[in-house]
Regions:
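Helix-loop-helix
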Residues: 1-238
Length: 238
């Protein structure tokens, strides 16, 4: 258990804390809100290879969807289905579980960010690297009226709305697929409608800085998804 806590602290919590302190110290007015947005952008850049691979996997899965349905209809035996699907994925260079890694990384990041603000300001000097100095003062008012150290309903709502649009955009163009595929349709419904509601109620209980992180992360994800879609359309016209 100690080893797991050490890994979590050194890979997620301390880098996140020190990055936030660094940006806060460097920004004019010691603006914590801008520091959270900058830190989110850095995290997005670091995780870009994983999320980019996940998006391309989704596009490939959409292309081979008719072949997947054919395998399910022609092979009623579960073992034969599994072998046929693995052969199909290998032939098209698709790893259906590659996207889960990007999603799994988000959870410890959210927990670590919550821990950073739960401990509050001033930042714990003992957790900072030797070359990072905590600022004497920190501006915790984002846009002049949102207190980032306290829950904020409006920022939580914005995070949920962007989560909705991000999930909607992530769906393959062409709808929810075959109506007979009730499992797929149920999962898509949960991702589009239920998960944003869950995001709102979770974010509403946490410091607004976490909501700001969630909002910024979804905003950058929407831009990324839109760029990938535009590239796919451009490639299709060539």
């Amino acid at each position: 258990m100690y080893f797991i806590k050490l890994i979590y602290s050194e890979i997620f919590y301390r880098p996140l804390l020190n990055g936030l302190v660094f940006f806060t110290s460097m920004l004019p007015g010691r603006d914590l809100g801008l520091a959270v947005i900058l830190l989110t952008l850095i995290i997005k850049i670091i995780t870009f290879p994983l999320t980019h691979k996940m998006l391309h996997t989704q596009k490939k899965m959409k292309k081979i969807e008719p072949e997947i349905k054919k395998i399910y209809s022609e092979n009623k035996d579960k073992e034969k289905q599994a072998h046929a699907l693995m052969a199909l994925y290998k032939a098209h260079g698709v790893s259906p579980f590659s996207g889960f890694l990007a999603l799994l990384i988000q959870m410890p990041l959210l927990i670590a960010l919550y821990q950073v603000f739960w401990k509050g300001i001033p930042f714990p000097q003992s957790e900072l690297y030797a070359f990072i100095a905590a600022p004497d003062q920190v501006n915790t008012l984002f846009l002049g009226f949102i207190q980032l150290m306290q829950p904020n309903m409006w920022l939580a709502a914005l995070a949920a709305i962007l989560q909705f649009f991000q999930a909607k955009l992530a769906l393959p163009s062409g709808g929810a697929g075959d109506k007979s595929d009730t499992t797929q349709r149920a999962l898509q419904f949960q991702m589009i409608y239920f998960f944003p509601i869950l995001v709102f109620f979770i974010a509403f209980k946490l410091p607004a800085a976490v909501s700001l992180y969630w909002t910024a992360m979804n905003f950058f994800a929407i831009i990324h998804e839109a760029a990938v879609r535009r590239q796919a359309v451009s490639d299709g016209k060539q």
